[in-house]
């Protein structure tokens, strides 16, 4: 039986062996649609199971995602060979998954270090303004970062209202989805395109009219709905003492500087063309991308070190959402290997 050190040496040898890369070529045109079933299964599980069997999903989503990943990886290894499976696994890990998770973590940490304080009243005008601001911010700090920054202020502003479900639903539509369409920072598929060589400003140059149209229509629908709902609210007694009013402001302002650093690091990795490339099991890792990822880790550490505990407590900052996202996207990135090859 191999000792642990021998297994480690074997694993490291495979990890840094570029020669197996030739086994990783996949002819996407010859693949059947059956190879896309695990990918569809992951997406359907994420969409349906939290609604149908929420307790099962909450406690076992990691196992379910792992099951779909293995449903792809094991047949892949059997059909194309272990070397091909290994090389594609390393490529998905180093070229796509790790950069994505590191960027998302940095944006999540930086956004979690900014707290918007102040007394807000959830009128249709204010709610619409918050959603519009969130739509803009989502393309620069990610849909996750913008959502984390603004969801609590808008919930606080509407806390006295008897019905605010539509506010959260439109928040998800506008801030958590449509708003992140203009830069690679906004949405995972756009960031993957950026990693593949798509220019940083391509989406802004080509789809800003479509994004503007979609966001304006959604904001208009929301304003009409929210105005109707607001007028049906029972009258609230105006017994708020002057001392209870708090001026609008920000805690953790240094994180805005760190947010600018995140944008600069991503831009740097796309602009700087370095000849220095590290070959890891057939996956080329360029120096700009490596420095970007290391820089993002440093930014996240600085944010955690400089942000007061009071701000994190006020934001109810925790790691569970990031752990969940990391597990889910691990399955997504693995099961998309064949789907991307077919495309």
Residue ranges of predicted features:
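Cytoplasmic-side transmembrane-helix entry/capping segments in multi-pass membrane proteins
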Residues: 6, 58-70, 94, 98, ...
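Transmembrane alpha-helix boundary signature
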Residues: 20-23, 54-55, 73-96, 105-123, ...
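Hydrophobic transmembrane alpha-helices that form the pore/transport pathway of multi-pass ion
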Residues: 125-179
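Interfacial loop-to-helix junctions that mark the boundaries of transmembrane helices
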Residues: 24-35, 56-65, 86-99, 200-210, ...
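Transmembrane helical segments that form the transport core of multi-pass membrane transport proteins
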Residues: 259-343
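N-terminal secretory/membrane targeting signals
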Residues: 1-23
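Juxtamembrane and boundary regions of transmembrane helices in multi-pass small-molecule transporters
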Residues: 56, 163, 182-183, 192, ...
